[in-house]
Amino acid sequence: MQYQLLINGVLVDGEGERQSVYNPATGEVILEIAEASPAQVDAAVLAADSAFAEWGQTTPKARAECLLKLADSIEQNALEFARLESQNCGKPLHCVINDEIPAIVDVFRFFAGAARCLSGLAAGEYLEGHTSMIRRDPIGVVASIAPWNYPLMMAAWKLAPALAAGNCVVIKPSEITPLTALKLAALAKDIFPPGVLNVLFGRGQTVGDVLTGHEKVRMVSLTGSIATGEHILRHTAPAIKRTHMELGGKAPVIVFDDADLDAVAQGVRTFGFYNAGQDCTAACRIYAQRGIYDALVEKLGNAVSSLKMGTPEDESTELGPLSSLAHLKRVTAAVEEAKALSHIRVITGGSQTEGKGYYFAPTLLADARQEDAIVQREVFGPVVSITVFDDEDQVLRWANDSRYGLASSVWTQDVGRAHRLSARLQYGCTWINTHFMLVSEMPHGGQKQSGYGKDMSLYGLEDYTLVRHIMVKH
């Protein structure tokens, strides 16, 4: 099993404190990995800074060729990547193989093509005797911090656009789920020039702070919690670094009385509980119009209770464990707080399961109120609440009454209503009669405290570039 860091094109052992990496399906230790030392973090950043002088000047075609080689290599090693991700995260193996790996490969291939399409605007003469041009240039060294819910996919979302734009990257995966990023490092070292891509391991306070605070790092890209985002912004503010933040969500799912309730129930069953609900866009905050509320509660209860929990290796498993014991405790505490409210009804689930591993039963909580914590806070687990509403204005007000602004969906047969709400919902993405669906060509990112900047799409590529004005006198 690959456990070494990638620094300046060489795989090396960490020199810092050793940390245990767990299998969440069993609670057992997979292996121990040594963190990067401060000196190794410094070496990785300096290697990236040195490599940028040449990599930043390579042609888009040359960068695209490297990204395509990496995509091919991931595809060729798909089963090994899937097994590592499943073992380290507890994800059902078939979900990683069939859903995640193809999407990861596609992200690298998309940005390989996008790199060759990015250009500055050809301008003209805005001052007599002078011609202006616009360039889009790479930023420099990017520090990327990837989360533990989709370790390899989020690494791909960060690496592909940054490298395609001509930046050099030092990435730190979560210390909870580092195995696929470290495997990726072993493949990347034979594809990219030394220093272009560096992969470290360690905790935020020992490695992340040193990395993001390094004077040679010009941009920090984070997918994580609001608290982590706040910390990084405070930490990097004195150096005025560029930042790219995706900080979670609490997606409202608005169901009107003309919606297809069977489609809603099956949609929430999938989109609310995929990856054990550990997804920033999870369909977790349901608003149902009064006329269909009781019927939807019943249908959702039946759908959610039919989800099959099991071991990641079982092809029939739909719901795996949560990623860590600490997170299991957080999810349990959030549900217990909700259950303590006299008006909350537990339709199904509501507790962790017996036996080994960090499993929490798929949970549906009915009669939640707008002010309840279960409606306002991100649980990031297999927990969905449902709240009754009366009219369009009320539900729009409630849906926007959130510090989050990442994703939302509207379920209705009224096209006009769908357009009205999607125009007024304060979310980076609004789906109509579906949820959760993402493609490489379209941007993903939030507003409000869900952060700023876009992943995927040409907008994501542009986020990793600088706009520069060139003026020529003639």
UniProtKB/Swiss-Prot annotation:
Binding-site residues for NAD(+), renumbered to this chain: A146, P147, W148, K172, P173, S174, E175, D209, S225, I226, A227, T228, C280
Keyword NAD on entry: yes
InterPro entries in UniProt: Ald_DH/histidinol_DH (IPR016161), Ald_DH_C (IPR016163), Ald_DH_CS_GLU (IPR029510), Ald_DH_N (IPR016162), Aldehyde_DH_dom (IPR015590), Aminobutyraldehyde_DH (IPR015657), PatD (IPR017749)
PROSITE patterns in alphabetical order: ALDEHYDE_DEHYDR_GLU
Active site: E246, C280 (nucleophile)
Gene Ontology BP terms: L-lysine catabolic process; putrescine catabolic process
Top-level taxon: Bacteria
GO molecular function: aminobutyraldehyde dehydrogenase (NAD+) activity; NAD binding
Reaction catalysis annotation: 4-aminobutanal + NAD(+) + H2O = 4-aminobutanoate + NADH + 2 H(+); 5-aminopentanal + NAD(+) + H2O = 5-aminopentanoate + NADH + 2 H(+)
Annotated keywords: NAD, Oxidoreductase
Recorded metabolic or biological pathway in which this protein acts: Amine and polyamine degradation; putrescine degradation; 4-aminobutanoate from 4-aminobutanal: step 1/1; Amino-acid degradation
Quaternary context: Homotetramer.
Other comment: 4-aminobutanal can spontaneously cyclize to 1-pyrroline, and 5-aminopentanal to 1-piperideine.
Record-linked HAMAP family: Aldedh_Prr (MF_01275)
Family recorded in the similarity comment: Belongs to the aldehyde dehydrogenase family. Gamma-aminobutyraldehyde dehydrogenase subfamily.
Protein name listed in UniProt: Gamma-aminobutyraldehyde dehydrogenase
Organism: Salmonella paratyphi B (strain ATCC BAA-1250 / SPB7)
Lineage: Bacteria, Pseudomonadati, Pseudomonadota, Gammaproteobacteria, Enterobacterales
Gene this chain is encoded by: patD
